[in-house]
Amino acid sequence: MDEGYYSGNLESVLGYVSDMHTKLASITQLVIAKIETIDNDILNNDIVNFIMCRSNLNNPFISFLDTVYTIIDQEIYQNELINSLDDNKIIDCIVNKFMSFYKDNLENIVDAIITLKYIMNNPDFKTTYAEVLGSRIADIDIKQVIRENILQLSNDIRERYL
């Protein structure tokens, strides 16, 4: 960390980074242990609820998403980027992010979920797209992708952001 760009308490930041690193590693192991016991319909419903800001943190994958969202939220660029777009560009973004759900790449899926969560913070978009989003995600089976890629993604996030 370049102290020239940081004016807060370095000890506090290092503690936060260490805590988030430990939390992400722990939740990743919980996802690996529990993913097979989570019904796909419940998983998809919990993902939609997470996007709509109603998280079920008893679902370990949702806890994983919540932790990643917290870590990435420290990098406010995504929210600022979305806020700078007009409605048509946001609609294009929603459509493009949906395409990520149909690929076997967990990083793209998690990025899509988090981006959609940022977008759905806007009440107008939440009202307009909540039902469509829920029905589209309900048809997707991402458990296999989670099972195969969660450990690598967790390691990548810790490397990139922490």
UniProtKB/Swiss-Prot annotation:
Pfam families: Orthopox_A49R
Source organism superkingdom: Viruses
Entry similarity comment: Belongs to the poxviridae A49 protein family.
Protein name: Protein A49
